[in-house]
Structure formats: structure tokens, C-alpha cells
């Protein structure tokens, strides 16, 4: 027996390994066809039978009824295969009407619109004509010269009717040949000699220098090569024979009342047939040319409409003025074939209902309504009833089930025992949106859901619905139990933290239970036994909050029980009782007021040390305990729980005074409107925070009251602090002040809402707040769609990323260190490396002991060793450096976050990465509207304080002492480090240019000491020498203007764009410093003291005044701040993964060198960098309005910013390489999510970046057939080079390019996957010309062709089947030999 048969018979979808797409030749179309359709009729209106030779003809497409010919002469199975001599119909199954095709012989050739109009037009590229010219020929406007003969006309020249007539008169009728219509295009395509054309183009490419021409030639050459390789003939792009798709795919159905509904395709086909028949008649009757041509043009338009309606000219519309759905529309978009029917199918054995909470369920259970279960498990019930002899036949069983006989329920109980069902809540944003549960039969009509899985499903019980699906086969049930059971999905695949964490009421209950109150009855009593305590509690000697001492047995490291005395409360001991005994899980972890965070940590600990089963039991018991005490505590809140702090009015008055001062400064012209706005907004932000802090303090310490029933702790405070419900933000609005509101465009309104919800809002405040609330609502509506789209794009780009091997054997890796921002460690090294593998052997820096072997997984134990060794950076393996040719290897990926072990082969990590990044995006958009538009913007940072007692070290210290004896920072990249006693870096702060430095290098500072301060709203321009000011190129009204503020009437001088004036073109406004002799001062770097002023700079000095060192001569105002929320964030993530150029992007230095300003060009400034190694200097042209962050003579390092802004990703890749680029993208994406408190593992982002870096651009073709500028897949490039080296040729050279995810998805190796993503027609056109082969490696293409996906179980089945085939072949060879 062959091994392959062991896997059962291969289904149709498994009998092929790859799919190829080509252009169909006329002969192929005829070979598919079962007959020609010559009549436009569909069915006979009296008999309702298909018309002969019409669009539904039974002779061509097959019988309408199974095994019955049209006239009824032959019926039943016995006659199968007979062709009726009367009506000509073959007696067979009617299903063939879905498979058999027909054809239409066109009376004139027609250009296929996809090859003509789908940009770039393939026909026009091949013939080297413009699209307009082509259309003129095809639609019978102009003639084209095919052979100039004896005339002086050019080949391919276009002639109008008159010009043709003139030429004929001039040269004679037969002197040249010119023709019109699709026939001539077909002839021209036929005449192309590709081998010769390729040679000519190649030579031309070598000789040309024009970039535009090169691009055009490369395009044409690529197309020629595609045709040569795919063996497609170019004349097939012009159609002679039109295929007619099977009738069942374009059905005609009868509605009630005798009317018919038909597919649009039938109407489009009818038009084609009508026009074709008319054209045939006209040609036969030798009608005048002009009429025939008009008919040909109409036929061309009819075929265009059939293939792609609306692509050219006006779309063909039906009686209701709605455009017809053409063949292209059937494939395109969400409702098209790919996405509607192939990627998303509706399934049988499923149902949906509303969900309700099921607190008494176990974690692996769900409650399924009896009615639903009866319907869903019908086939199982039928077979059981028959098996037990309760019903004699299936029909009898069916009747019993419909009557709902008592024995049916007993059988149902048995059928569903241990038969898992899948529950799914839409939208399924990550894989935890579908989980398996064992059903329990319940009365009622709602599905009961376990409270702990709500977080994973993102479900609540306000009317949410869920769908139930039944896994039918034993394999499906097995997979559901092993992979999808809720108890097997405790950790989140996005960050490896537990996702089964108590929430809301449970947290509140546990928090209440673990509170310890002072002066409670029975304080200080000692107990050694829980039963004794229970007795005391029952008799009211103690309460659950009384502080007591208790002797508790604890497991030590040797595994022995040791008694310890702990200070605790009865409530905490109840939680302690649930803890599994393990030496690593100490009582101290729960001997405190438990907040949501603490509970999460405890669950994580239990999972890491005691395994999954213990965790599930622990979580379930915690939940029951939490619910019990949330109920018995009776916590709720009323009006009095919202406390308005007494200090509120004081804070508000102070702030109003502060703002009056700003107004005054603004009126005096000391600050600009933008600065005033920023200062006002900041002042109110601070005020709101102060009021809120005072309120929180008051809530946290309720008034002392000796009444017995007095509530000892504020309910609102309890809810917020425990993490059960509500946030600091919301409570601030209830009892503090609502604060600043945002406008719909993200701008902050200057006047805050001083009232809170307890006091009530004034009419004006109400209006203002409606503005903000509306913003929240709109955000939710709009952003959810764009977030879903982002997820879809991510899934598409990463879907074929699968773990395919254990180790790729690479030595490469990336270096990681902790993320420090504003002097604080935001993400520790430990967080970044946990679950990754070491790229090199790692040794202890002091003892030199080996901590980690290369390729070893960094787990919690190893992490402690690394931390104690004090390592601050580590080389780890990454998917970015993985060298597997298909997919990724386990070692480079590291730990599978959902299981905590090394990732196994076949895991679809690409999809998991996409879901992990996309899912929080959707959640965050929905979060905004809960705050109701209150602005969440921290005050701008304007100083740094020491976060530790430490020693100061200043890097690139360049300071001047100004007239007020203050140290002013003049360096652009000054950094201040805080070092501990051993000289290790504890914090790092960037000190901006123009800041006042309050400490010096080597100083010792204490915690909270101020180190430096600066104005956060302006960028100053500061002098480093004293001297006399001289204005240069400042012409009033051309390069500088007195701007008088409307509100204050104070004028200030502002630099303006000078390009609108002819004489202003060369102006470069600048300030020079003169010494006493009137000569320009020379600075320390040897250059003259010249300060160029960008557009928008506000002057702080007058011409001719004397200034001293460190004075500000001009200020550049910064843009006003808008709120930071995920709205700013999601588009930022999209911008990064789409690799778009940011709006005001930065310019980065490509080399180390000195800066010089060159001669300006029109509206651009010229920045020149002279490299240290004295190679060619590099020029940058930047718009004049942009703020240049370097000065003339500054020394810049490779990668430094020359202009403020976000750098362009492609520049980072080019200048700094892959690792720096990856670090930058990871850092930026993480910053967006971190702002919202979402944790995503770095490796997910790295997977996406890997997919963005799939292609290389050829810089030198060497001895290969690749073209310079062509973009090819990295692995293909390596394969081509290997071949070249084998054949003794020079390998090609290329550089890595970064593609956005949409582009990367569309250029994936699989055309099926790309076509189902976007731009379906373009992808299919390209693929058909190149004769592309889809190897069916990714997930999408396999789903589309109806196979198991090559991931998980499918991956191994595939692997084993391939091995079986190989062994079978070997066995058969051996047998033959034998």
C-alpha cells in the first residue's frame, strides 16, 4: 500500500501544487467551449425553457433538470451520456451548467480593455505609442501607417481621413499601407519580433543617459521579457473569440408574480451578441465603410462594458440608471468573488444569540440554550437515536426531534458531553476572538459566557451577540480542544501577559476584601487556625478588615513546610488559601490591598511556576470570591462621594491672575499670540491637575466618623484605585474641574470648563463640552474603519510569515538596550529581551562566567542573572536578521508569547503579529469617547530635574556665560548624564540649544534638584560673542515685515518669504556682529559671526544696538500644541508601516562633516556638508521656511538632523542601515501604544518590518539578465546570483529598499493573495502577461483554493504528505530495480 493513500484520497484541491495564470489564446477559448452562442435570447417566455443557441441554451450548457433532456424524450439515470437526437441535449447532471462554457465568434477583433486601459497600458507600452493614439486607432478616429512604402510617411504615423485622402492623391493608392481599427493593432502586435526588440532595447538602454528615457526603456524591456518567458503571444491581447461563462454563474431567476431577475452579465452579453450579429449582417451585405465602422466601434464598447464597465467612457446603465456589474466588478472589492465568497464564507452548523453573564460556569464552559443545541447537533442526535434503536429510520428520528420528545433531550445531553463548541464575537480582531468551550445546556434563549474571557472577546453584556460554531469531524474537535479551549489561552499572544484577569466587580470585591482598617474590632489578636478565625468572625470578635497576626505554613525552597507569622487580615487569608503552594509564590504577593495590577501579577506568577491547570483553578476561585464580596460589600456611590476640594477656588483665582499677566505681556508685545496661547493652555492644564490632586487627596482620606455604619473608604476612590472602573481622568471631571476641551480639529479651546459634573455646567460650558463630546463620537465612528483597514493591510503583508525551521544558523543579530526618555527608564532591558535568544555567547563582565550560550532562550531565570551582572545592552537574534529562505526560524523568533515556550514549527507568526498591532488600534479608537472630549495634554516640558542623587556628566558641553551670569547651552547635541557611585549611567537627558544650565560637569546633585530650564515654545538664536548688530538683506516689505498684532497694536519684525518679488529672490536675511572697528567678528570656529534667519523668525533686537554674549537675537515660535491621543497615534502608525514621507520631514546628514551654507536657489536654501575624509561634499536643498537646526561651521555626525521633524524612513535605511531603521520604527510605534498603556512585544513589529524589507533594487546587473533599477525579491536575487556565479558570470549588485505594507502586499510572490487584497484587475493583468506561477505558500491563497492552510496542523500534514510522496517514489524505484 502506498503511503500517500494513508492520508485518504486527495481532494480536487490537493491534486495540484501550484496555479499558473496566462492570457487565453483564441484556440484555447474554443477548446473550452461546448458550442457557439449566436442568439441573444435567454428563455422562452411561454414555456420557460432555454432558447436554442441562446445564452441559456441546453444543447451548449447542459440539461436544466438532472438526467433529463429538454424535450423529455430521455429521462432517468439509465440514459446517462446519451445525446438526444431531437433537442441535441446530453443527458447528464444539471450541475454541468455551472462548468460548461460557450463562446461567441466576433465578427471583428476587439482590444481587451484590461491590457488597453489598465495603467500602465500594456499594448501602448509594447507598441511604444501613447494611449490617446491607440484609442484613436481602436475607436476609428485615425488611420495608422503600417508600411510607408514609397511615400515619405513614417511607420506608425497617424493620419486623419482627410490626410489619408491627400496622401493617396499625392503618392497613389498602392504606394503605402494604412489601416484602422483593432485589426491593425493586432497586425502590429503580430509583427513584433521579441528577440530582436529585446536586443535593440538593451542596446538603447546602455547608450542613453536620460533618466526618464531609461525608466521608459526598462518598463518596455521588462514587458518584452515577460512575454518571452511566459510564451504568451502579444496578439492574444486582441480578442477574436469571446468566452461565455456558464449560465448558472449568471442566473436568471423567476420572482413571485411572473417577473424575472437576471444577472447584469446576461444583459451585457446580449448587447455584445446583438451588435455582433448586426455587424455580421452589415459585412455580408457590403454596407458602406462608415456604417460598418460605427458598428465595430459599438461592438468594442459592448465588450469593454462586459469586461470592465465604466473603465472607458460612460458606464452602461440599466433602466434604473444603475451601472451594470461587469466581470471585473464580480472580482473586485469587499463584495467581489475573492473577499465575499472565497475568503469569507457563511458556514453551516452555526447560530447566534445574545450573551449573558454566567458567573457559576467553570472557565472551560459556556451555557448553550437547549433550543439552539437541539438545532445545531441535529445530525448527531439522529445517528444516536438510530444507534440506540429509539428511532427506526432517520425520518422517524427527524419527527421525534421536531416533536421534542423527552428521550431526545437525554440523547442531546449525551451528544454534547465533551463535544466542544466554538464561540466567536465580531469583530474578531485577534485570535482570541474565537475560543472553544464545553457547552452546558441551559433554559432560556441567551448564551451564557464566563466573565473571565470577556477581556479576550472584548465582550460586555449590554446586548452583545455571539456566534456558535460546531466542529464536526473528530480532528476538528481535537484541534478545538487542544488549541482553542479557553483554558489553553491564558496568555495574550501580543505581550505574553495573562489575559484571563479579573476585572470590574471581581477586582472591586477583592480590593474590598483585602483592605485593612485601623482601630477595627479585635485588632492585634493572634490565630493559628482558619476555622478558629471563622468562629471569631461569626461571633463578631473580628471583621474581615481587622489587622491580626496569623501563623501560616509556607513551602520553602527545599520543599518543606515552615511556619511563619504574618501580619494580615482575615480577608487576605481567604485569598491566600486559594494560592497553590509553591516556594516562589509567597504570601507577601497578596498580603496587601489587591489592585487589578497586583492580581494580574499573581496570576502570571502562578502560571509561570505552577502551570496551566493550577492557574485556571486559581483564576476561577478568585472570580467566585471577588463576586461574593463585591455583592456583600454593598459598594455603590452617591452624590456625596464626589468631593469638590476647598482649594479649588484658590487654584482657579491664581491661574486667572497668571493668565492676566500673559495677556499683559502679549499686549506689551513681549510674546506672540502663539506663545500666549501655549502658555494659557499650559497654565490651565496645571491648574486642572492641581485641583484634581487635591480632590484625590480628600477622597483618599475620608472624614473621621465614629458611627458604626459609617463607610470608612470612599467608593469612587475605591473603584478608581483598584482599577475596577473609572479613571483618574473621569473622577477629575466629577469632583474637580472638567478642564480644557478639544475642538473637533484637535486644537485646545483656551477657556476651560471650570465647573465639574457635581456642581453642574453653565450654558456656555455646556456648549463647549458638547464640542468635545462630539469629537469623541466622530473619532470613534471614523477611526474604527481606518483602524480595521490598517489591521487588514498588516494581515495581508504578513500572512505568509510562518515558522518553517528550527534554526537558520545565522550569526547575525541586533543590539538592544533599555528605552530612556526624559531621563527615565521607560522600558527596561529585561522587558525587551525576555523570550528572545542570544545572538552571541554572553559572559559576566566581572567574573567572566558564561551566562548564556549563543542561540539559548532568555527565560526568567537567565534574566535575573543578566540583571545582576549589570549588563546594559545585549545582542539578540531577531526575525530581521533571520536567513531562512521561506518563512522564519524558531531560534530567531524566540518564545511563543501565548505559551511561554520556544515557538513551534508551523506557527503563523505573521498573522499573530498583524493582529497584535491592529487589535489595540481598534480598541483605542473606541476609548476616546468615554472621556467625553476632555483634553489630555501634559504641560510642555520646560526643565529637567534630577531623579536620583548622582554625579553630573555633560556630553558635548559648549556653554557661554551671558550678561546675567547664567550658563547658556550653545551645543545642538548636549546631553546631561546622571551617574551613580560606580560610574554607571542612571539617567540621560537631552538639553536643548539655548537652555540655561544650572549645574556643571562633575557636580554632585540631590534628588529633585533642577538641572536646566528653557522656554518650551520658542527656539532661540543666541550670540556667542558680544558686538554691534548689523541687519543684512532685511528689506522692509520684501524680506521683513512689521507685523502689528490686531489685539495689542504692538509691532514686531518678522522674516517673510521673499520669493514673490523679483528683486527679493537673492535676499538672505541675516544678522552680522561687528566689532568696535566695524568689521565682522570671527567666531571660535574660524567663521564670521553671521546668523541666518528662517521665515517666521521674530527679531528681538534692533539694527545697530550693542549686545552681549548669550543674548537672544531672534526667536522662532514653535507650532501650538494639539492633544496627544491615539488619533494622533493611529495615523502615525499607519504612516510608519506605509513608509510614507512625513509632512514636514527632517533632513539627515549622510556623512560626518562640517556644515556650510551655500548660495540660495530660488525658494530653497543650500546646505553643504564637507566630509572629514575630504571626499565629494554633499548638497541639500531645503525650503527657506524650514528651521535649520545647525549653524555654519557646526560639526555633524552621520544621521544627525539638519532640519527639525520626523526623518524619512528611506533616508534612515540608506544612511544608517537596517538595524537603526528597525530600532526607529519599533521605538516610534511603541511610543504611540505606550501613551495609551498598551503593551505589544517588539518582535511583532519586527515581523512587519521584515516584510517591508523584502525587495532589493538592482544597482549593477553584472552578468545577469536583471535590469538596473528593477526591483526583485531578496531571495530571488540571491538565487539568480548563485546561478550567475556557477556559470562563471559576474553577480549583480543591489541595495535593500523599504516598501510600505500596501505596496509590499501587492508585490508579494503570490498573485492570488495580491489580487484578493487590492487593485484586483491590475494584479491579474500583470500576472497573466508574465505567466506567473503561484506556489500556494501563504495562508490566503490556500484558503482561496479551498485547502487547509499551511500553518499549524496543516503545515505538518503538508510536510508528512510530501515525505510520503518522496518515500513512495523511492520504494517504487527500489521495487523496479528489484
Swiss-Prot record:
Organism lineage string: Bacteria, Pseudomonadati, Pseudomonadota, Alphaproteobacteria, Rickettsiales
Entry protein name: DNA-directed RNA polymerase subunit beta'
GO cellular component terms listed in the entry, alphabetical order: DNA-directed RNA polymerase complex
Protein's UniProt keywords contain Nucleotidyltransferase: yes
Family statement drawn from the similarity comment of this UniProt entry: Belongs to the RNA polymerase beta' chain family.
Function according to Swiss-Prot or TrEMBL: DNA-dependent RNA polymerase catalyzes the transcription of DNA into RNA using the four ribonucleoside triphosphates as substrates.
Co-factor binding details: Binds 1 Mg(2+) ion per subunit. Binds 2 Zn(2+) ions per subunit.
Residues reported in the UniProt entry to bind Zn(2+) 1: 69, 71, 84, 87
Record EC number: 2.7.7.6
Binding residue positions for Mg(2+): 460, 462, 464
Chain's gene name: rpoC
Molecular function terms from GO: DNA binding; DNA-directed RNA polymerase activity; magnesium ion binding; zinc ion binding
Amino acid at each position: 500500500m502506498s503511503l500517500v493513500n494513508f492520508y485518504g484520497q486527495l481532494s480536487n484541491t490537493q491534486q495540484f501544487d501550484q496555479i499558473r495564470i496566462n492570457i487565453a489564446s483564441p484556440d484555447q477559448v474554443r477548446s473550452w467551449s461546448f458550442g457557439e452562442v449566436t442568439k441573444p435570447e435567454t428563455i422562452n417566455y411561454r414555456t420557460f425553457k432555454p432558447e436554442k443557441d441562446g445564452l441559456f441554451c441546453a444543447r451548449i450548457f447542459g440539461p436544466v433538470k438532472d438526467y433529463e433532456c429538454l424535450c423529455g424524450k430521455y429521462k432517468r439515470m439509465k440514459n446517462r451520456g446519451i445525446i438526444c437526437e431531437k433537442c441535441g441535449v446530453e443527458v447528464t447532471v444539471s450541475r454541468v451548467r455551472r462548468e460548461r462554457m460557450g463562446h461567441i465568434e466576433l465578427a471583428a477583433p476587439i482590444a481587451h480593455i484590461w491590457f488597453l486601459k489598465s495603467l500602465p497600458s500594456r499594448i501602448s507600452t509594447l507598441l511604444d505609442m501613447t494611449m490617446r493614439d491607440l484609442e484613436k486607432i481602436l475607436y476609428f478616429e485615425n488611420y495608422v501607417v503600417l508600411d510607408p512604402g514609397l511615400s515619405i510617411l513614417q511607420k506608425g504615423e497617424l493620419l486623419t481621413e482627410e490626410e489619408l485622402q491627400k496622401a493617396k492623391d499625392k503618392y497613389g493608392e498602392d504606394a503605402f499601407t494604412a489601416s484602422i481599427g483593432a485589426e491593425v493593432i493586432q497586425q502590429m502586435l503580430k509583427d513584433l519580433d521579441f528577440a530582436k526588440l529585446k536586443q535593440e532595447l538593451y542596446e538603447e538602454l546602455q547608450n542613453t543617459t536620460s533618466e526618464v528615457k531609461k525608466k521608459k526603456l526598462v518598463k518596455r524591456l521588462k514587458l518584452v521579457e515577460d512575454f518571452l518567458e511566459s510564451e504568451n503571444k502579444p496578439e492574444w491581447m486582441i480578442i477574436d473569440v469571446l468566452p461565455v461563462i456558464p449560465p448558472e454563474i449568471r442566473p436568471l431567476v423567476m420572482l413571485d408574480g411572473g417577473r424575472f431577475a437576471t444577472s447584469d452579465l446576461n444583459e451585457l452579453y446580449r448587447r455584445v451578441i446583438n451588435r455582433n450579429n448586426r455587424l455580421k449582417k452589415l459585412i455580408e451585405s457590403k454596407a458602406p465603410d462608415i456604417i460598418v465602422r460605427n458598428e465595430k466601434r459599438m461592438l468594442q464598447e459592448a465588450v469593454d462594458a462586459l469586461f470592465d464597465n465604466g473603465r472607458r467612457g460612460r458606464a452602461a446603465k440599466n433602466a434604473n440608471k444603475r451601472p451594470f456589474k461587469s466581470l471585473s466588478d464580480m472580482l473586485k472589492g469587499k463584495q467581489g468573488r475573492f473577499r465575499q465568497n472565497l475568503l469569507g464564507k457563511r458556514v453551516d452548523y452555526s447560530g447566534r444569540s445574545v450573551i449573558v453573564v454566567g458567573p457559576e460556569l467553570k472557565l472551560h464552559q459556556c451555557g448553550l440554550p437547549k433550543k439552539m443545541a437541539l438545532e445545531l447537533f441535529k445530525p448527531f442526535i439522529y445517528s444516536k437515536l438510530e444507534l440506540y434503536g429509539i428511532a427506526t429510520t432517520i425520518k422517524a428520528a427527524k419527527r421525534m426531534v421536531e416533536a421534542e420528545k423527552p428521550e431526545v433531550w437525554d440523547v442531546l445531553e449525551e451528544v454534547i458531553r465533551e463535544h466542544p463548541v466554538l464561540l466567536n464575537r465580531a469583530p474578531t480582531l485577534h485570535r482570541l476572538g474565537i475560543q472553544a468551550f464545553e457547552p452546558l445546556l441551559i433554559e432560556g434563549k441567551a448564551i451564557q459566557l464566563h466573565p473571565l474571557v470577556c477581556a479576550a472577546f472584548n465582550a460586555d453584556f449590554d446586548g452583545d451577540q455571539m456566534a456558535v460554531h460546531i466542529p464536526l469531524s473528530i480532528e476538528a474537535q481535537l484541534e478545538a480542544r487542544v488549541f482553542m479551549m479557553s483554558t489553553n489561552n491564558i496568555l495574550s499572544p501580543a505581550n505574553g501577559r495573562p489575559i484571563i484577569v479579573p476585572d470590574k466587580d471581581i477586582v472591586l470585591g477583592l480590593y474590598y476584601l483585602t483592605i485593612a482598617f485601623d482601630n477595627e474590632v479585635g485588632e492585634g489578636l493572634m490565630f493559628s487556625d482558619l476555622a478558629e478565625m471563622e468562629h471569631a468572625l461569626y461571633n463578631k470578635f473580628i471583621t474581615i478588615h481587622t489587622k491580626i497576626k496569623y501563623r501560616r505554613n509556607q513551602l520553602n525552597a527545599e520543599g518543606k513546610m515552615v511556619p511563619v507569622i504574618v501580619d494580615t487580615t482575615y480577608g487576605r487569608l481567604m485569598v491566600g488559601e486559594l494560592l497553590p503552594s509553591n516556594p516562589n509564590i509567597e504570601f507577601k504577593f497578596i498580603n496587601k490591598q489587591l489592585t487589578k495590577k497586583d492580581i494580574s501579577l499573581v496570576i502570571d506568577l502562578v502560571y509561570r511556576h505552577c502551570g496551566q491547570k493550577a492557574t485556571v483553578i486559581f483564576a476561577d476561585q478568585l472570580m467566585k470570591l471577588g463576586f461574593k464580596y463585591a455583592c456583600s460589600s454593598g459598594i455603590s456611590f452617591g452624590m456625596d462621594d464626589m468631593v469638590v476640594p476647598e482649594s479649588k477656588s484658590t487654584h482657579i483665582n491664581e491661574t486667572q491672575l497668571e493668565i492676566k499677566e500673559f495677556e499683559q505681556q502679549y499686549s506689551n508685545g513681549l510674546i506672540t499670540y502663539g506663545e500666549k496661547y501655549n502658555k494659557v493652555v499650559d497654565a490651565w492644564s496645571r491648574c486642572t491637575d492641581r485641583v484634581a490632586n487635591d480632590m484625590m487627596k480628600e477622597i483618599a482620606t475620608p472624614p473621621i466618623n465614629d458611627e458604626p455604619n459609617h463607610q470608612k473608604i470612599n467608593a469612587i476612590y475605591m473603584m478608581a484605585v483598584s482599577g475596577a472602573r473609572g479613571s483618574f481622568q473621569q473622577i477629575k471631571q466629577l469632583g474637580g474641574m472638567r478642564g480644557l476641551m478639544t475642538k473637533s480639529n484637535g486644537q485646545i479651546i483656551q477657556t476651560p470648563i471650570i465647573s465639574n459634573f457635581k456642581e453642574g455646567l453653565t450654558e456656555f460650558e455646556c456648549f463647549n463640552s458638547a464640542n468635545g463630546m462630539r469629537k469623541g463620537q466622530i473619532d470613534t465612528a471614523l477611526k474604527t474603519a481606518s483602524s480595521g483597514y490598517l489591521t487588514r493591510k498588516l494581515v495581508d503583508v504578513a500572512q505568509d510569515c510562518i515558522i518553517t525551521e528550527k534554526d537558520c544558523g545565522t550569526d547575525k543579530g541586533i543590539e538592544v538596550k533599555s528605552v530612556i526618555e526624559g531621563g527615565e527608564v521607560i522600558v527596561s532591558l529585561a522587558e525587551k529581551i525576555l523570550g528572545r535568544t542570544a545572538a552571541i555567547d554572553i559572559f559576566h563582565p566581572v567574573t567572566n562566567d558564561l551566562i548564556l550560550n549563543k542561540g539559548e532562550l532568555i527565560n526568567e531565570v537567565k534574566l535575573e542573572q543578566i540583571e545582576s551582572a549589570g549588563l546594559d545592552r545585549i545582542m539578540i537574534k531577531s526575525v530581521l536578521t533571520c536567513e531562512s529562505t521561506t518563512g522564519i526560524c524558531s531560534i530567531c523568533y524566540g518564545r511563543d508569547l501565548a505559551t511561554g515556550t520556544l515557538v513551534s514549527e508551523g506557527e503563523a507568526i505573521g498573522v499573530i503579529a498583524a493582529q497584535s498591532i491592529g487589535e489595540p488600534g481598534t480598541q483605542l479608537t473606541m476609548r476616546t469617547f468615554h472621556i467625553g472630549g476632555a483634553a489630555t495634554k501634559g504641560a510642555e516640558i520646560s526643565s529637567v530635574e534630577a531623579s536620583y542623587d548622582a554625579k553630573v556628566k555633560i556630553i558635548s558641553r559648549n556653554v557661554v556665560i551671558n550678561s546675567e551670569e547664567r550658563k547658556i547651552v550653545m551645543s545642538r547635541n548636549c546631553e546631561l548624564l546622571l551617574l551613580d557611585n560606580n560610574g554607571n549611567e542612571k539617567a540621560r537627558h537631552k538639553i536643548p540649544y539655548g537652555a540655561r544650565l544650572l549645574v556643571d560637569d562633575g557636580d554632585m546633585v540631590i534628588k529633585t534638584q533642577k538641572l536646566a530650564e528653557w522656554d518650551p515654545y520658542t527656539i532661540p538664536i543666541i550670540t556667542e560673542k558680544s558686538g554691534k548688530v548689523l541687519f543684512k538683506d532685511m528689506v522692509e516689505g520684501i524680506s521683513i515685515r512689521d507685523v502689528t498684532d490686531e489685539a495689542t497694536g504692538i509691532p514686531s519684525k518678522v522674516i517673510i518669504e521673499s520669493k514673490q518679488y523679483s528683486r527679493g529672490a537673492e535676499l538672505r536675511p541675516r544678522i552680522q556682529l561687528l566689532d568696535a572697528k566695524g568689521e565682522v567678528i570671527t567666531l571660535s570656529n574660524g567663521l564670521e559671526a553671521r546668523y541666518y534667519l528662517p521665515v517666521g523668525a521674530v527679531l528681538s533686537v534692533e539694527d545697530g544696538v550693542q549686545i552681549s554674549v548669550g543674548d537672544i537675537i531672534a526667536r522662532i515660535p514653535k507650532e501650538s500644541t494639539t492633544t496627544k491621543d491615539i488619533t494622533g497615534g493611529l495615523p502615525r502608525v499607519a504612516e510608519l508601516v506605509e513608509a510614507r514621507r512625513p509632512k514636514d520631514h527632517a533632513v539627515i546628514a549622510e556623512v560626518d562633516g562640517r556644515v556650510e551654507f551655500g548660495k540660495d536657489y530660488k525658494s530653497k536654501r543650500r546646505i553643504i556638508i564637507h566630509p572629514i575624509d575630504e571626499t565629494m561634499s554633499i548638497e541639500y536643498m531645503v525650503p527657506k521656511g524650514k528651521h535649520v537646526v545647525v549653524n555654519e561651521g557646526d560639526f555633524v555626525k552621520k544621521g544627525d538632523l539638519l532640519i527639525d521633524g520626523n526623518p524619512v524612513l528611506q533616508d534612515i535605511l540608506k544612511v544608517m542601515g537596517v538595524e537603526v531603521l528597525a530600532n526607529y520604527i519599533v521605538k516610534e510605534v511603541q511610543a504611540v501604544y505606550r501613551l495609551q498603556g498598551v503593551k505589544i512585544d517588539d518582535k511583532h513589529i519586527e515581523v512587519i518590518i521584515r516584510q517591508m524589507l523584502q525587495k532589493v533594487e538592482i544597482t549593477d546587473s553584472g552578468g545577469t539578465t536583471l535590469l538596473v533599477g528593477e526591483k526583485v525579491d531578496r531571495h530571488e536575487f540571491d538565487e539568480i546570483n548563485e546561478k550567475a556565479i556557477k556559470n562563471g558570470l559576474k553577480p549583480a549588485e543591489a541595495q535593500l529598499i523599504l516598501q510600505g505594507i500596501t505596496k509590499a502586499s501587492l508585490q508579494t510572490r503570490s498573485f492570488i493573495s495580491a489580487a484578493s487584497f487590492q487593485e484586483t484587475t491590475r494584479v491579474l493583468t500583470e500576472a497573466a502577461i508574465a505567466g506567473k506561477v503561484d506556489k500556494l505558500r501563504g495562508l490566503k491563497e490556500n484558503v482561496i483554493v479551498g485547502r487547509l492552510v499551511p500553518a499549524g496542523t496543516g503545515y505538518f500534514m503538508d510536510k508528512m504528505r510530501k515525505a510520503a510522496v518522496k518515500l513512495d517514489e523511492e520504494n517504487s524505484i527500489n521495487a523496479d530495480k528489484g
